[in-house]
Amino acid sequence: MSGLQSHILNESIGESREIKEYNALPEITLESLKERLQRDCNEPITSLGQFPDPLLFKGMKEALDIFIWAVSNNKRILCILDSDCDGVGTFITSIEFFKYFGYQNVEFLIVKRHEGYGFIPKHITDRQIKPDVIITADNGITAHAATELATQMGIYTIITDHHQPNYKGVPKASAVIDPHQPGCTFPFKDINGTVVVWYFYWAIAQRLNLNFKNHWYEMMAPELTLTTIADVIKLQGLSRFLVKDGLKKFYTSSRNWVKVFMEDRKEVDAEALAFGLIPCINVAARLADATHAANFLVSPTYQIAKEWYKYLKQLNDHRKEKQELLDKEISNTYPAWLEHPFI
């Protein structure tokens, strides 16, 4: 019996200028710009204690009921994760959660780029052993066909995502956790997939009356920061705190990938991550396999992390070389294109 099962059993802007000559534009004043700037930089969250409750997510209670039932009965869980930096972040978050609680009847699938986007029927039909529960992270909100197939096969589906539903609406899954679905009362809509699934796992611990939030945040803060920057999330409220506070964690983090990244750096900021590290993580899925980036982030030793980082940087250098050659070929073949006002 895993530890998780055991817990379950126990339960400078100048002077104001009025733009009047353009009737189609609103009047812009210095005061209105100041108000907008203040609103955009507003920090309603300044500490972990101010994080909104997980149950504010629509669908969270239903997802918790399914998860608790699954682990109570040792059901097989399949986690389906996207392959970009945010998707790999959800993978690391999921790995760390299940490892921490000792639940082993779980499998992780990072979607391969050539297969298409997100959860698809193939992820069910190609498996020799049918899962009892499927959890998606950073994908799933548009997976109508796969969700319908899972339901027909008696598989529970828990969708955790941060993208907008498409024209078909929200899939008819067993539970959907997405701040953009109609009726969701979670106050911050601009969050990424790693944050959503991190919230789901926190909610599980909260349901079990475990004092887990502080430890869970400290453990995963670098990944929450990294993926928020990678997905170019608007920095307001929760996401702003995650980046501002999370960057500080890079100086004290015990994560091996963080130590390697910080090896030759006296300081780290969002730009360093956006242009120094994130392209190296994203390139894995584009030119090789997203699991290579995942291996870097979960490296058990500093030396292994260093080797993976070296490999990813070389892969990204190769991508840049290919891009330069492609740009040169296009400029030689279609020189007029480069003068086009929209290129």
Locations of the language-model features?
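Non-catalytic nucleic-acid-binding interfaces of large nucleic-acid enzymes and RNP effectors
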Residues: 3
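Hydrophobic/aromatic beta-strand patches that form the interior of the parallel beta-sheet core
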Residues: 135, 156-160, 175-177, 224
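Short, ordered loop/turn segments at secondary-structure junctions
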Residues: 82-83, 111-113, 139-140, 162-165, ...
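Short, glycine/polar-rich helix-capping loops at beta-to-alpha or helix-loop-helix junctions
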Residues: 122, 162-172
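Hydrophobic helix-and-loop "lid/oligomerization" segment in the mid-to-C-terminal part
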Residues: 7-133, 153, 206-343
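Phosphate/diphosphate-binding loops
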Residues: 137-149
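Catalytic PLP-binding core of fold-type I/II PLP enzymes
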Residues: 148-160, 164-166, 232
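Short alpha-helices
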Residues: 93, 169-211, 217-230
